[in-house]
């Protein structure tokens, strides 16, 4: 994820985020005797960045790199405003997940980076056409956790950039759907 911010805590010049796994695994792969298996995925159906994988899976989580509103066929920014750009970001995320046979509703966290907070209403319109995605998710009104960050600048002057975290419940390496166990989705929307 690349973005510009106007100020960082304590006047820092750089802030970095890291995600670390202790390598012990989770259901269904625990214990892994300390072996940490990481699976990297790239598909030509979404934009490819030579500096990062489209997704990296470990344990039962899959972290997708933030998607810009790029046409995967050309690698260029799509035409249009924030509505079209948000739609393309989500289409790119969906293409990455489809390339791994992971349903869109397995997304547990979405981070949306906007240049202008006033665009949030338009982004929400597009967002609701993607979530919930399946009949099961609609039945329980499942939507992932979401954070919106206002950035003072995004790569290629994009208006929006979206990243996602998936918990597909099948471990790493992925297992057949019929072999999954221990994953229960309960939405508590009150």
In which residue ranges do the predicted regions lie?
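N-terminal presequence-like segments and the immediate start of the first folded domain
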Residues: 1-91, 95-109, 113-190
């Amino acid at each position: 994820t690349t973005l510009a911010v106007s100020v960082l805590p304590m006047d820092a010049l750089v802030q970095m985020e890291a995600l670390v796994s202790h390598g012990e695994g989770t259901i269904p792969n625990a214990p892994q005797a300390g072996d940490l298996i990481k699976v990297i995925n790239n598909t030509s159906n979404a934009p490819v960045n030579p500096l990062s994988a489209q997704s990296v899976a470990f344990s039962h989580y899959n972290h997708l790199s933030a998607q810009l509103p790029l046409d995967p066929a050309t690698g260029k920014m799509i035409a249009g405003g924030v509505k079209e750009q948000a739609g393309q970001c989500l289409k790119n995320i969906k293409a990455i997940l489809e390339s791994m046979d992971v349903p869109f509703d397995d997304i547990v966290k979405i981070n949306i980076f906007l240049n202008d907070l006033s665009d949030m209403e338009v982004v929400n319109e597009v967002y609701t056409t993607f979530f919930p995605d399946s009949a099961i998710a609609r039945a329980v009104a499942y939507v992932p956790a979401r954070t919106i960050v206002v950035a003072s600048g995004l790569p290629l002057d994009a208006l929006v950039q979206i990243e996602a975290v998936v918990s597909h419940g099948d471990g790493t390496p992925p297992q057949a759907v019929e072999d999954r166990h221990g994953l229960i989705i309960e939405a508590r929307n009150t």
